[in-house]
């Protein structure tokens, strides 16, 4: 593991000193390091300290993940065995269970900005699992979406969208006597 430390500074001025190998899990940081664009610290203007600390916790746990990037010059790490993968999956589930939905939305934005693919997938899957069995009204409430259709307009749109299901299939009808 690299002993080089990188200082990451959040949008609210909070600084985090992390191992370079952990910082490289943030693809935006990895590219800055590869392009020799780093002097003393890396400012991350779109991420608050609270969210960055959660992202870094995830990255520290996933520092040994296999990266399927053929252009990577780093030696490939061996694929984790089934038990290690199950342990990591269990850790991910526990990690997400303790985070409220508002923070998950902020993590999605941060993971996208920082290009942390594993965290982006995990957070998006968590939201997808959460809304899976919800009604449209419950989903609107969760995402603060205002329904601008009246009940009648909504029914008509559904009828139009599914009109094919109500059309008579003339090819298979019995001919009239």
UniProtKB/Swiss-Prot annotation:
Pathway: Protein modification; protein ubiquitination. It is found in: Nucleus. Keywords: Nucleus, Ubl conjugation pathway. Residues 108-167 are annotated as: Interaction with the F-box domain of F-box proteins. Expressed at low levels in seedlings and leaves. One of its GO terms (biological process) is ubiquitin-dependent protein catabolic process. GO terms for cellular component: nucleus; SCF ubiquitin ligase complex. The keyword Transcription does not apply. The keyword Glycoprotein does not apply. Disulfide bonds: none annotated. Part of a SCF (SKP1-cullin-F-box) protein ligase complex. Belongs to the SKP1 family. Involved in ubiquitination and subsequent proteasomal degradation of target proteins. Together with CUL1, RBX1 and a F-box protein, it forms a SCF E3 ubiquitin ligase complex. The functional specificity of this complex depends on the type of F-box protein. In the SCF complex, it serves as an adapter that links the F-box protein to CUL1. This is SKP1-like protein 15. It comes from Arabidopsis thaliana.
């Amino acid at each position: 593991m690299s002993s080089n430390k990188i200082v990451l500074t959040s949008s609210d001025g909070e600084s985090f000193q992390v191992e370079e190998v952990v910082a490289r899990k943030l693809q935006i940081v990895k590219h800055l390091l590869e392009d020799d664009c780093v002097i003393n610290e890396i400012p991350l203007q779109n991420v608050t300290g609270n969210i960055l600390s959660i992202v870094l916790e995830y990255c520290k746990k996933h520092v040994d993940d296999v990266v399927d990037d053929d252009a990577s010059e780093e030696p490939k790490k061996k694929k984790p065995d089934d038990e290690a993968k199950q342990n990591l999956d269990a850790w991910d589930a526990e990690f997400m269970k303790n985070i409220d939905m508002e923070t998950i939305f902020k993590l999605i934005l941060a993971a996208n900005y920082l290009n942390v693919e594993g965290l982006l997938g995990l957070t998006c899957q968590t939201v997808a699992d959460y809304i899976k069995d919800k009604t449209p009204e419950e989903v609107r409430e969760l995402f603060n979406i205002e329904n601008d259709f009246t009940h009648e307009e909504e029914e008509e749109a559904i009828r139009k969208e599914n009109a094919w299901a109500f059309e008579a299939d003339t090819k298979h009808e019995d001919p009239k006597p």
